[in-house]
Amino acid sequence: MKCKKCDQKAVINLQHHNISFCKEHFLEWMRVQTERVIQKFHMFTKEERLLVAVSGGKDSLSLWDILWQLGYQADGLYLDLGINDFNNYSSDSAEFTRRFAEERGLQLTSMDIKAQYGESIPEMAARTKRGHTKPCSQCGLVKRYLLNKLALDGRYDAIVTAHNLDDEAAFLFANVTHWSLDYLGRQYPLLPATTGFARKAKPFCQIYERESAAYAILSGINYIYTECPYSDGSKQLRNKRYLNMMEDEQPGFKTQFYLGYLRALKAGAFPQQQESAAKLEEKRCAKCGQPTQSDGLCTFCRLVNK
Ligand code: Q46
Ligand code: ZN
Ligand code: ZN
């Protein structure tokens, strides 16, 4: 197997594109693909300031590295969730992220949630009805809220997350199987800024998980291999397995599934998007001033105030 570009021995074969690359040309291909997606969806420019959500894992560190190599002004934000019960997931991922930023001279903001709000994510979740077994919904809520708040406070032009094609396709699969029209109206790789919400972009939305892992390994990025202990047995992982079976049978399936959805969304298949955004802007949290659907406090303030 030879590299498509230089005839050297290939180190990776991209079945869905039917091409193979050597290390150097694969790393270059990843940067070109990412830049293409940024341009295609008019995500952001080199003059704008970006806040990248980093977890210490392969996707976020690969994306941060690529944005840096492409010349974007990308700072990192690491949220320490305080998940250290079964393994040292949070402490270790904080260390991988810190070292990555230090080696490249990149600006990293870290927030320790327990130090800031008095409780770790599992402790906060344990006080809620459903969160005592799995803290994922509270974790998602806190991460979304703080990422947005810190981006607005820091006057960043956009939030960048490393959701890859496997993540997006699995989320889409869940939304389609439940016909969650509200979510289906919002799963665009670029969400423009609205009152109280920063712009959000997903430049890896067309990059397979396998490709971002290969990028991290081949470019020598040290990332955390262990997953969060709470991700075990999640619906998202189960849906990824189903989609992997489809992809094995039919290389390129995930790309077709996701790009087909984006075409339908653009054609106006899910008009709920505007309606729910308008509803949200009517009310404000009494404590933090963020738009909220409920009266009084927003869901974040209710969770941390208990
Ligand atoms: S970090 Fe948080 Fe995930 Fe862990 S507790 Fe669940 S949501 S699984 S991306
Ligand atoms: Zn080559
Ligand atoms: Zn609030």
Residue ranges and their predicted role:
Residues 39, 166-170, 174-204, 209-212, ...:
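Flexible helical/loop "lid" subdomain adjacent to adenine-nucleotide binding pockets
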Residues 2-185, 194-197, 209-219, 285, ...:
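ATP-dependent adenylation/nucleotidyltransferase module used to activate substrates
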